[in-house]
Amino acid sequence: MGRFGAGVARIVLAGASLSLLAAAASAQDACGHRGELDTLYCDENKDLVADIPKDPKKFRDPSTLVWAYTPVEDPAVYANVFKPFTEHLEKCVGKKTVYYPVQSNSAEIEAMRSGRLHFAGFSTGPTGFAVNLAGAIPFAAKGLESEVRGYNLVAVVKASSPYKALADLKGKKVAHTAPSSNSGNLAPRVLFPEQGLKTDEDYKPLMSGGHDKSVLGVGSGDYDMAAVASDVFDRMATRGTIKRDDFRIIYKSPVFPTSSFAYAHDLKPELAAKLRECFYSFRFTPAMTKEFNGDDRFLPITYQKDWKVVREVAEKSGTPYNKAAYDTESRREADAAAKKAAEAAAKAAQQPAAPKQ
């Protein structure tokens, strides 16, 4: 299939038809209850996720399935890790299945909203936006036996630094990851003030673009502290990207649920059921188990129950999972990316030219 059929993925992504968007725009013309969902969707059973279309003609049953995984780190990291799983899905579901790397949370959400992604793994915070704005239905999370394992927000500093508590970081360079991230932005805004450090008052968060980039930035001295997900930090240490002893954790939050796996609400019900079956029956390869901190399978979840604490953090941080908040966060994400690119270009321009041979 070659890099998970990346060429096919580009064709499928680029070829999302206008008729699909028109169908989505006219969906759920008569909706008895919508809740927090976008106007494209309906939630008449009040389970907080989009109902399937009332008209069976609007069910989607694509010949090629396209999926993605949250870009909490460099998307290339997961290309080979997920290859055996993608191959399992092809055989189990009986459809060509393509893994497509996405570069940002907003790009992943937009791809599902427009019909270009059929299922995807979303990180904790963006799951709420994916549910409300893209019609995503979370159904699985990584875990071990009967336990879905979570992660913590951790505040990471250099081991040699003088910082012992969050309050020591007032006026310092603190990295957040992306505006829609739970542990990388929203949770610090809610939880850090309890420890004497207020975002935007005591420090101006610097958006790094990823949890791995934040950790590496602390190691290189670009940041004094970084708010990141513990599972990403642990994976970086396990694979040797960083040395754990070079860092200290000065704060650790209560547990949050980890990334969710969700399919589009308008997939044909039989296809959605088959995806659930194929996820739950898969056992991770040794490489996947190592990469995901010992997890060895996918377990059932629901957005209503398992994401309750995350929704509460979003509300308390002033970032509810609605279109207005999403547009604001997307602009911040784009601005941060543009600023970082400009800084990188300026830094490159200052480098002395290589001597001519």
Model-derived regions, located:
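N-terminal hydrophobic or amphipathic helices and topogenic motifs
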Residues: A25-A107, E291-Q357
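Periplasmic-binding protein-like
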Residues: T70-P71, E145-V154, T241-F279, P286-V309
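Short beta-strand-to-loop elements that line the ligand-binding cleft
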Residues: K96-Q103, E201-G210, R248-Y251
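Alpha-to-beta junction loops
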Residues: R113-F122, G135-I137, K172-V174, G219-V228
